[in-house]
A protein has these predicted regions:
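A detector for small-residue-rich transmembrane helices and their helix-helix packing motifs
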Residues: 10-287
Length: 287
């Protein structure tokens, strides 16, 4: 069986070291063959969601106020004079709620005047519901796994973190007066998805190959200029953008969810992943 030599034949030249690396006979792979970085990240997300489920509603909201990203906080830190604008926007977004609830929201999210810059990252560890977490977990396992195999744990987590921050910043830019907390790992996962687009649509690549570290690292990554000539990659990107915009605009209902989709954060994370992937990539590059 020559399956271990496949990446050399399909994706480039092999020297003696690479040939020996790919030469071991095939072994039985587990059904869920996830990289350790993905497994540990999923475990952390599940443990956080489980821990929050044990908190009272008030304590959970306090936790959210410290870890979720609130665009209006960053706006007031940068432009303190826009307090009236924030209050007006909050009155519109919380219309129909009790006045006491509004005051409670202001006290928790805005009263201390702190910007809490760490929330640009920590919001990615929180989720609105178990369904929200499960949907993100499935997407992370599918698209984060090949990226984690190619980059290694450290670079993969750095990419996720940068995409998470990029998603928060684009969300803030588009909704700078919003007092509603932003939560979810979707921006980071969108960044990993964009990174995967740079190499998973290589000609001749089979889906089963993405479970092999050596194969994934041997696939030449598409330069951004050439990516637009890859019809499969372009189709995926188009479907991804259209789907996110439709869900974000509320044109397509979200089963079991009452919250809206922060599609701007998804797009911000996707763009960061697409652009920064080459800086972190340690695999083959297509010339």
């Amino acid at each position: 069986m020559g399956s271990r030599l496949a990446p050399c034949r399909r994706f480039g030249k092999c020297d003696g070291r690479m040939a020996s690396q790919y030469s071991p006979p095939p072994r039985h792979e587990p059904v869920f063959n996830l990289p350790s970085a993905v497994v540990w990240l999923l475990a952390v997300l599940v443990l956080i969601q489980a821990g929050r489920s044990l908190l009272s509603d008030y304590d959970d909201y306090v936790l959210m106020s410290w870890l979720a990203f609130v665009p209006a906080r960053l706006t007031l830190w940068l432009s303190p004079g826009r307090l009236d604008d924030v209050v007006g926007a909050m009155a519109q977004s919380t219309a129909g709620q009790d006045v006491a609830d509004r005051l409670h929201l202001v006290r928790l999210l805005l009263a201390d005047g702190g910007v809490r810059l760490w929330t640009l990252l920590t919001y990615g560890f929180l989720h609105g519901s178990w369904l929200h977490l499960v949907s993100n977990a499935v997407w992370l396992a599918a698209f984060g796994s090949p990226v984690a195999r190619r980059l290694g744990p450290g670079r993969f987590l750095n990419l996720m973190a940068l995409a998470t921050i990029g998603g928060a910043l684009l969300h803030w830019w588009s909704r700078d007066l919003d007092v509603l907390p932003l939560v979810g790992a979707s921006a980071g996962i969108s960044g990993a998805t964009a990174a995967a687009v740079r190499f998973v649509f290589a000609p001749g690549l089979r889906f089963g190959d993405l479970g092999d570290d050596a194969v994934v690292r041997a696939i030449p990554a598409e330069p951004l200029g050439q990516l637009w000539r890859n019809s499969r990659a372009l189709l995926f990107i188009a479907v991804w953008f259209v789907t996110n915009i439709l869900f974000g605009a509320g044109l397509v209902p979200i089963f079991g969810e009452e919250t809206s989709i922060a599609w701007e954060a998804h797009i911000g994370g996707f763009v960061v992943g697409l652009l920064l992937f080459p800086l972190l990539d340690r695999g083959q590059q297509r010339r």
